[in-house]
Amino acid sequence: MSWRNLVDQLPVEFDPGLTDAEVERAQQRFEFQFPPDLRDFLQTALPRGPLFPDWRAGDDARLRDWLDGPRQGILFDVEENDFWHPDWNARPCMIEDALSVASEGVKAAPRMIPIFGHRMISAEPHQPGNPVYSVHQTDIIYYGFDLADYLRHEFNLPDRAAWPAKIRPIRFWSYFVQ
């Protein structure tokens, strides 16, 4: 995959890509590892704009809120819309207990890393080719079968590949798109 070729086609402003040290600093600061394809993309060029996370110089509080968005959205649906994930066993009767179980359940799930707005990719498994999701509370859908497909989809580029017969399952998150 030539990330430079794809970057050159995107109608997005870019800064120079992240250095190895900047990648390591972001990963340590926020306690996750970029999947290899996202890391390669971000090291080719760093997208710029209000809907892109700024892993180089972005506000820590804003980035932490963005990273916590999927958990907060799911907790909202647990409290307001009676959502309950089957991995969490029986739902406690008291809402405070249900929220505690749900919060721990989401924390145990693979970390979702923002790419653009509420489009996110799982940090696990740590290999290229994880699907990209659109995540809004428990309204979660695929938005690309991998990072390159997602970017072509999001920015209306031609030559999108056909969807594969099977998209890599991601622990916990694949439940929402079944």
Language-model-detected regions and their locations in the chain:
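Short, solvent-exposed polar/charged micro-motifs at secondary-structure junctions
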Residues: P47, E124-H126
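A generic structural signal for short, non-catalytic loop/turn and secondary-structure boundary residues
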Residues: V106-A108, H126-P128
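A surface-exposed partner-binding patch
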Residues: M1-K107, I113, G117
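Extended serine/threonine-enriched, polar tracts that run as long, contiguous segments within proteins
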Residues: H118-S122
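Glycine-rich, aromatic-bearing surface loops/beta-hairpins
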Residues: Q127-V177
